[in-house]
Amino acid sequence: MKYLHTMVRVENIEKSLDFYCNKLGLKEVRRVDNEKGRFTLIFLAAENSDEKTGLLELTYNWDPEKYTGGRNFGHLAYSVKNIYEVCEKLMNNGVTINRPPRDGHMAFVRSPDGISLEILQEGKSLPEQEPWKLSLIHI
């Protein structure tokens, strides 16, 4: 058995592609418009992955629908070569870092559809670095 893809439902293709491609750095590798089913599937891959497995499938239903109660997903996880650089790039592009990488290992952000993305440092944690360092409060 091998991992193929993770599917998340999105409400706005443009906002989602801006987030996942322009801000996070994924690339679109395939798109399927299904007129009979009234939906579009967009498959995205990480920069250095093959284009058949480990994909993110964005599902856009043409008829408007709000996704509540976990109907759109939990979280996605990606490993990166430098968590600080990735978080800085995201922040500079207007993305809120919900859980900063203070430990040099893990961070969380959210997509425009509220999907949580876990960003993990590849290999060992990086040493603490500004502006992400933990501040000690002296009383």
Go through the PLM ranges and name each one:
Residues 1-17, 73-76, 123-136:
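N-terminal beta-strand motif that seeds the catalytic metal site of vicinal oxygen chelate
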Residues 7-53:
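Core segments of cupin and vicinal oxygen chelate
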Residues 16-21, 90, 114, 139:
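Conserved active-site tyrosine of GNAT-family acetyltransferases
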Residues 35-37, 50, 64-65, 123-126:
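Flexible, glycine-rich phosphate/dinucleotide-binding loops
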